[in-house]
């Protein structure tokens, strides 16, 4: 049964929404990125509320299975898109669904495994699906024709499946693709907890040392949750947790409680890089011997937000694992929503011993904004496709400020697939 505090939290949403609306039209809100959009501010309120629930209370708002979301909810609103995707909604194995299953796949054709966020205790949301499908629709036709996409249907901690259940499920699907089928071009794309699982899986592969091991050829990390429990000393001015506590979807109080983290990780060791990629103390050599990160033939994309609580921990991880020193060279928080390549973009190509890298800090961006707050791009795509006189939308014609994350991920995939 849902706890009293959880019930009161959910029942209080309408009251908090009313207060938010009054503030929006009077004194203003701390959500800088969406200060001119009441709709987005209300959505942010709902997302903050969901993440604030205990792991067990989250069970009562995670009642929709991925099967239901993929095959009922998304087609209900976007049938014109899903009906044209080959293999959409069919199972690959017990742990995954195809979003796109290209016919006549070759072993070197790319297969992207999308690993959804939600703290390991919240289910995939239609918003995330809309953004992922928007990315696919904007990829160049010749690249699109070869790209297949899987959704990892991992079990939730709120249903009694703590970590490493999710790691084991990913490994089972990965082995099916690589060992049993011989696929050689696997991409991992994860947001938040999905980013955590993607990075932890690299450490898992490193430790297992399987024969003829195939590492992911590409990694797309969207606001990866690299440090599961914030340190006690982060709530000081100048730290992203403190500065963005009122701006972001994520707040210190949501994961500062050790009990909540234990309910997610089970008996997992928070000092293990498989569980907590941002565990400290860490060393550069912890991330050596992982081709995905250390070989220029591999590609990595990372995005975080200036107004994101996880920002500092993500940039700390980038320093140790990717040799990117932005966290020590720049101070964030004063971009005035203007993109400046210096400090907010880091691109590296063809450096010996290092992967091809694109790292972005979105001005005023918040946690997971490209999947939860850019999903309305799918409506523009549908409108364009409904007019037979118009050609398909090109990513270069999309507003790259409104759709900051999606446009850059698509450009990355267009250039690297």
Give short role names for the model-derived ranges.
Residues 97, 150, 358-362:
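General small-molecule cofactor/ligand-binding pocket signal
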Residues 111-113, 150, 301:
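Conserved beta-strand elements of the Class I
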């Amino acid at each position: 049964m849902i706890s009293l505090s959880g019930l009161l939290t959910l029942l209080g949403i309408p009251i908090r929404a009313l207060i938010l609306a009054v503030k929006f039209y009077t004194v203003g809100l701390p959500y800088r990125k969406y200060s001119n959009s009441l709709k987005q501010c209300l959505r942010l309120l709902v997302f903050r509320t969901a993440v604030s629930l205990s792991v067990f209370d989250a069970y009562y708002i995670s009642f929709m299975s991925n099967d239901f979301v993929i095959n009922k909810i998304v087609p209900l609103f976007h049938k014109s898109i899903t009906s044209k995707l080959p293999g959409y909604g069919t199972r690959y194995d017990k742990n995954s669904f195809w979003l796109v299953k290209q016919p006549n796949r070759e072993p070197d054709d790319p297969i992207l495994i999308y690993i959804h966020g939600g703290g390991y205790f919240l289910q995939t949301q239609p918003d995330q699906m809309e953004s992922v499908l928007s990315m696919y629709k904007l990829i160049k036709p010749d690249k699109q024709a070869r790209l297949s996409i899987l959704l990892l249907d991992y079990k939730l901690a709120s249903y009694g499946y703590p970590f490493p259940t999710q790691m084991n499920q990913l490994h089972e699907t990965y082995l099916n693709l690589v060992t049993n089928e011989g696929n050689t071009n696997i991409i991992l794309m994860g947001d938040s907890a999905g980013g955590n699982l993607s990075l932890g899986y690299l450490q898992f592969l490193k430790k297992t040392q399987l024969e003829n091991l195939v590492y992911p050829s590409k990694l797309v990390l969207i606001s990866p949750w690299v440090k599961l429990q914030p340190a006690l000393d982060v709530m000081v001015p100048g730290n992203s947790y403190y500065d963005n506590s009122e701006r972001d979807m994520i707040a210190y109080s949501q994961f500062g409680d050790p009990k909540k983290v234990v309910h997610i990780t089970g008996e997992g060791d928070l000092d293990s890089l498989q569980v907590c990629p941002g565990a400290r103390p860490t060393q550069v050599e912890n991330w050596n011997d992982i081709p995905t990160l250390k070989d220029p033939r591999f590609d990595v994309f990372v995005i975080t937000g200036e107004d994101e609580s996880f920002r500092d921990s993500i940039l700390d991880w980038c320093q140790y694992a990717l040799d990117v020193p932005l966290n020590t060279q720049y101070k964030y928080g004063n971009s005035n929503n203007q993109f400046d390549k210096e400090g907010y973009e880091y691109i590296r190509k063809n450096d010996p011993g290092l992967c091809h890298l694109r790292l972005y800090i979105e001005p005023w961006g918040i946690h997971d904004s490209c999947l939860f707050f850019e999903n309305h791009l799918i409506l523009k795509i549908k409108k364009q496709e409904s007019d037979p006189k118009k050609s398909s939308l090109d990513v270069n014609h999309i507003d790259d400020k409104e759709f900051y994350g999606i446009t850059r991920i698509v450009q990355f995939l267009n250039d690297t697939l």
